[in-house]
Amino acid sequence: MEPATGILLPLLHRLPMELTDLPYSPGALQPHLSERSVALQHGQHQRGCVDQVNARIVGTEWEDAPLERIVRESQGALFEAAAQAWNLQFQWQSLRPRGGGDPVGRLADQVKRCFGDTASLRKAFNDAALGLFGAGWAWLVLHPDGSLAVVVTRNAATPLTSHSVPLLACNLWEHAYYLDYQNDRARYLEAWWKAVNWEFAAEQMPG
């Protein structure tokens, strides 16, 4: 019997966009973020966004486009799914096991110039994050003029669509912290800073 290639090949076709792996194990950010919380965000929420992107780009002009281009150039439901998928992946890189502390080198100099010190940056970041009503993201970004700033975006909006360079991302959707901290966003932010990846942030700075 000949193989039913007309049926099998479409099922084996590689989807345009795949869920990227975590840069560490789901339990590696404990005790700041639990294994269950990380696994839920990555395995369900981020996977769901990737699935939504694939459902909308197969057979279209976007099918072979990198995720960053889709985020920058698409609109509507495709943008929302693509941007949230990108934001979530950037979030995982913004965190690391045994993270926290203070930045060093050129990034530390910029923090001192723009905020005075790391403690003042944390306060500005936390104030902005706590001031957001509903879902969204808090970011540390580098503006084209070389200054650092804290930016808050609503829902899936992202600085990737602006001229600023994102350095760090903090997920302010309630599902990001409810399992560990219920509705206490302030405690979540305190834990987030203990896992922040300053090395990754510094690597995003051009030049």
Give, region by region, the residue ranges found by the protein language model.
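N-terminal amphipathic/basic-hydrophobic helices that include classical n-h-c signal peptides
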Residues: 1-15
